[in-house]
Amino acid sequence: MSEQRSPMSGDSHPLRRSTDRASLPGTRTVSLVLTVRPGDGRPGAALDRLLGQVPASVREVVLIGGPAEAGAARDGLRVVRLGDWDSTRGDIPHAALLAATGDLIVLMNADGSMSPHEIPHYLHYLESGYDFVKGSRFIAGGDYADYPLSRRVGHHALLRIARRLYGQHLTDLWYGFCAFRRPFVDLLDLRGDGVELGAELVTHALHYGLRVAEVPSLELPRRHDPSHPRTIRDGARILGALLHERPHNALSRLAHGPFRGPSG
C-alpha cells in the first residue's frame, strides 16, 4: 500500500482530520456503484454473479446501465437501478454517485474485471483515516490480465506528466476501482464518462488535498465482450483530464528540467 498527499495546501479540503473521532469499524453505511458501459454486450450473467459476491458490509448497490432483468440480490442488499447509460451525456457516473446514500462509496465496473472480494480491503483504509482509496495493478500484490505494450508505454508517459503536474508518485492513473467518503461527491465536477473517469477522480482528490492511498488490485479477464482499447484516443482524453485539474503552478514545474521520479 502506498500513501499520497497533495502538495496544494491552499486548496485543501480534508474530509477527516487527526482530531476527528474515529468511528468503530463497520458502523458506517456502504454503497457500491456499479457501471455497465455502452458496448458491454450482454452483461446479465456476469452481473448476477457479481451481485452474489458483494460482501455483507455493502447495504446498497447503485446500478447504472444494467439490464432490467438482472437477478435478485441477496437479502439485506438494496439495489437501485438508474436505467440506460446515455452515451451522449458526460454526467452519468456523477448522477450514480449522487444517488448513493452510504457514508462510504465504492466505485467499480460490472464487466467482471474487478472483484467485490477486494472491497473490504478498500473499506479498511477508509476506516483507518484515508479519504480516497484507489486500486493499483502495478504495486506488489496487484496484477492485470491484459495490458498491451503500447498501453503500458502510454501509461508510463502519462504517469510522468502527472508527477510533474501534481508532485505525487501514484502507480496506476486511470484504474477505476476506488472508494471514498460521501462528502467527496459534493466536491466533484465530473466531465467524462469514459476511460478518463478514473483519472478525473484521482486528480480531484489530489486537487482538494485529500489523503490518498493505493492498494493492490487484481484486474481479471472481462466476462463478456473483451475490451478494445484505443490507446491514442484514450491517452488524449486522460491527458485532458490531468491538465484540466492541474494546480496553478504546475505548468512552470512541468517546464523546468527533465522528468524525474521512479518508474510507474
PLM regions: where:
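Hydrophobic helical membrane-anchoring modules
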Residues: M1-G52, G65-G66, G167, L190-G264
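Acidic donor-binding segment of Leloir-type glycosyltransferases
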Residues: L50-R81
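Active-site acidic Asp-centered loop
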Residues: G66, M108-A110
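Short aromatic/hydrophobic "clamp" motif used to bind/position activated sugar donors
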Residues: I105
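Acidic metal-phosphate-binding loop of nucleotide-sugar-dependent transferases
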Residues: G112-M114
